[in-house]
Amino acid sequence: MASKEIKFGRTAREKMLRGVDILADAVKVTLGPKGRNVIIDKSFGAPRITKDGVSVAKEIELEDKFENMGAQMVREVASKTNDIAGDGTTTATVLAQAIVREGNKAVAAGMNPMDLKRGIDLAVADVVKDLQAKAKKISTSEEVAQVGTISANGDKQVGLDIAEAMQKVGNEGVITVEEAKTAETELEVVEGMQFDRGYLSPYFVTNPEKMIADLEDVFILLHEKKLSNLQSMLPVLEAVVQTGKPLLIVAEDVEGEALATLVVNKLRGGLKIAAVKAPGFGDRRKAMLEDIAILTGGTVISEDLGIKLESVTLDMLGRAKKVSISKENTTIVDGSGAKTDIEGRVAQIKAQIEETTSDYDREKLQERLAKLAGGVAVIRVGGSTEVEVKEKKDRIDDALNATRAAVQEGIVPGGGIALLRSSTKITVKGANDDQEAGINIVRRALQSLVRQIAENAGDEASIVVGKVLDKNEDNFGYNAQTSEYGDMIAMGIVDPLKVVRTALQNAASVASLLITTEAMIAELPKKESAGGGMPGGMGGMGGMDMM
């Protein structure tokens, strides 16, 4: 086992604080409408320019192991906030730094760290309660656009694109952000359920110009196994032919004799048909087939349920107004599943999202939820250069997450004003002087956001805080973009409650841990052993007479 270096008490905390400061100082320059960019060197390709706090935090790794521990703890604040709320990473970092700094001073003055922590926890709970009471629910598309604009650093077009996307696919719908090949940013909306499987044979195409198979008022056969034997499919094919309606087959695969016969029938015009592979793999494939069944009002033909393909009747098939199949994707529009069944399935998937601990599983469940709940919108981000596109994509990702958070829990006045106002509303009392000091640490830390935004805008922080607090109105604040004072909500400067709340709770949680640290252990760097010397040369040839 490698030797370790241990630091105690004040020395440990000072080292840790230095690491916290280095990371937080790099991140906090990005805060606010006049926040600056940070350039990150990449081992390949052009440097990355970003104003996204978590992207900056993730790049920081310090040489000193003890300083690095402090930096990594604050990085954890940014990452956790990003995972839960999708935005507010810079806010969380600034708050964590402010609480750690003030807490460190209090510990150095001889106060009990555990009581300070209890005081901090009491104050944070009180502030969260105050914020929840002040939050305003979002109802209009304009309010959604406002939140998006603020998070995208004042880019109105981004706000409008996000508002339009949410209007079209619903609050639960999937909105993805991709890099475009053009200079313009555009929005594309896919209604209905889309999955990434195309037709199994180009002979199924009905529109040769676009290479798409369009089926109207269609029956859908869902089968979880491979279909290779034609005999077992004949009864259901004959039943569908008699209705004169088209049929879509979704199965693990359709191959051999079965596929050949379907293609021949399609070409002869006897049967309007198309076949695609089922989406996903393993258990996820079963779940997605079940989703399609619920959406279209059909049944998945599965041996688990004891249903044989030979005994399938028309009422076991799903129905949809339209199915559109390209080489890569299949879109089912307006399935005829019962609304109550779809709502039940949506509730079930939401419960699974709450329970899962895997980010990957959560992402896949959210995709399934969106496909059932409304549709998919894609924002394609354009720009003149690759660097510009990446920077813009970062901002749109943040704006999208902030907007979702705002729809969930409502909005509060932005620009750090909600927290500044809450600092004057903390009424909770500590059980002793040290807990009271912990409460005061939070009071002072809540001013740090407005101060930092003002500093980044080139204004005097103390004057800004003073002017805002002089006027006792919840929404009255400071607009750093124009250096004016007024009603923040009326000016469209709002923050999602979920983002502000998550940032504060995570910052206080990690900062409390840092304050209560008394010892730090790190591995000593390995001493490189010096390489062996060169072997000696040949000795002199003494004693030999030269002839």
From Swiss-Prot:
Molecular-function GO terms, alphabetical: ATP binding; ATP-dependent protein folding chaperone; isomerase activity; unfolded protein binding
According to its UniProt record, where is this protein located?
Cytoplasm
Which Pfam families does this entry report, sorted A to Z?
Cpn60_TCP1
Keywords in alphabetical order, please.
ATP-binding, Chaperone, Cytoplasm, Isomerase, Nucleotide-binding
Q: Which GO terms describe its cellular component?
A: cytoplasm
**Highest taxon above the source species:** Bacteria
InterPro entries in the record, alphabetically? Chaperonin_Cpn60_CS (IPR018370), Cpn60/GroEL (IPR001844), Cpn60/GroEL/TCP-1 (IPR002423), GroEL-like_apical_dom_sf (IPR027409), GROEL-like_equatorial_sf (IPR027413), TCP-1-like_intermed_sf (IPR027410)
Q: Which positions bind ATP?
A: T30, L31, G32, P33, K51, D87, G88, T89, T90, T91, G415, D495
Biological process terms in GO annotation: protein refolding
Q: What class of enzyme is it?
A: isomerase
Primary localisation category: cytoplasm
Show the disulfide pairing.
none
Catalysed conversion reaction: ATP + H2O + a folded polypeptide = ADP + phosphate + an unfolded polypeptide
Q: Which CDD domains match?
A: GroEL
Enzyme Commission designation: 5.6.1.7
Record-stated family: Belongs to the chaperonin (HSP60) family.
* Assembly mode: Forms a cylinder of 14 subunits composed of two heptameric rings stacked back-to-back. Interacts with the co-chaperonin GroES.
Function summary: Together with its co-chaperonin GroES, plays an essential role in assisting protein folding. The GroEL-GroES system forms a nano-cage that allows encapsulation of the non-native substrate proteins and provides a physical environment optimized to promote and accelerate protein folding.
According to UniProt, the name of this protein is: Chaperonin GroEL 1
Name the species this protein comes from.
Answer: Rhizobium johnstonii (strain DSM 114642 / LMG 32736 / 3841)
Instruction: Give the source lineage, highest ranks first.
Output: Bacteria, Pseudomonadati, Pseudomonadota, Alphaproteobacteria, Hyphomicrobiales
